[in-house]
C-alpha cells in the first residue's frame, strides 16, 4: 500500500509500502514463532531510547507477554511492516469490565520511519478494529519529550514564595 502525504500528494520521500497486520502473540518467548513479538517489543524500546535517552520506561519482552493474561483488558497489537521488518506498532487495550466504549492505543514508530504516514496507517487500522469491537471512544498515547528543565532560566517550578 502506498502512503501519501496529508494533502494527497505523492512524494517519493513520503511514499513507502507499508503492510499492517495483527501480531501473533506467542505462548513463550523462547520459541521460533516469538521473533515478530520480540521485534515489536524492540520497537517500543528504541522509541523510548530515542525519546527519553533511556529504556527505563520500555516494557521488556516478558512484561509485555504477561499483559496478555490481564483478565480486565483484552490486548492486541497491530504492526506496520516495511520490506518484512516491523517498523511500528500500536498496542490496543480494550477494557472488559468497565469503560466498554473505550479503546486505549499506544503508538510507537521507529525514528527513521516517523513522519512518513506509518503512524497514520496504524491508527486508522486500530480505529477500524476498535469500531468493530463496538468502541466509540479512543485514547491515544504517544511518546514525545517534554521541555528540558535546562530551558528554564528562572526557577519556574518553585513558587515565588520559595516554598516547594
Task: Mark where each language-model region is.
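Conserved acetyl-CoA-binding loop-helix of GNAT-fold acetyltransferases
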Residues: 115-128
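Conserved GNAT acetyl-CoA-binding A-motif
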Residues: 102, 130-152
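Conserved catalytic-core motifs of GNAT/GCN5-like acyltransferases
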Residues: 94-97, 141-143, 158-164
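A short, internal acetyl-CoA/4′-phosphopantetheine-binding micro-motif in the GNAT/acyltransferase core
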Residues: 106-115, 144
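Short, flexible/disordered intra-domain loops and linkers
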Residues: 29-32, 148-163
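A short helix-loop-beta-strand connector motif used in the catalytic cores of GNAT acetyltransferases and
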Residues: 64-79, 85-88
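Short amphipathic alpha-helix that is part of the acyltransferase structural core
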Residues: 2-65
Amino acid at each position: 500500500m502506498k502512503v501519501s502525504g496529508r494533502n494527497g500528494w505523492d512524494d517519493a520521500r513520503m511514499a513507502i509500502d507499508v503492510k499492517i497486520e495483527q501480531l501473533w502473540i506467542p505462548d513463550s518467548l523462547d520459541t521460533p514463532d516469538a521473533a515478530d513479538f520480540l521485534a515489536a517489543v524492540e520497537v517500543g524500546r528504541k522509541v523510548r531510547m530515542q525519546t527519553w535517552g533511556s529504556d527505563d520506561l520500555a516494557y521488556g519482552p516478558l512484561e509485555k507477554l504477561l499483559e496478555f493474561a490481564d483478565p480486565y483488558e483484552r490486548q492486541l497489537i497491530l504492526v506496520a511492516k516495511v520490506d518484512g521488518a516491523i517498523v511500528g506498532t500500536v498496542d490496543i487495550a480494550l477494557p472488559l469490565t468497565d469503560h466498554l466504549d473505550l479503546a486505549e492505543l499506544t503508538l510507537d514508530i521507529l525514528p527513521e520511519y516517523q513522519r512518513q504516514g506509518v503512524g497514520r496507517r496504524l491508527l486508522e487500522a486500530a480505529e477500524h478494529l476498535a469500531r468493530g469491537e463496538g468502541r466509540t471512544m479512543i485514547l491515544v498515547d504517544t511518546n514525545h519529550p517534554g521541555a528540558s528543565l535546562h530551558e528554564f532560566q528562572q526557577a519556574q517550578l518553585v513558587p515565588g514564595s520559595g516554598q516547594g
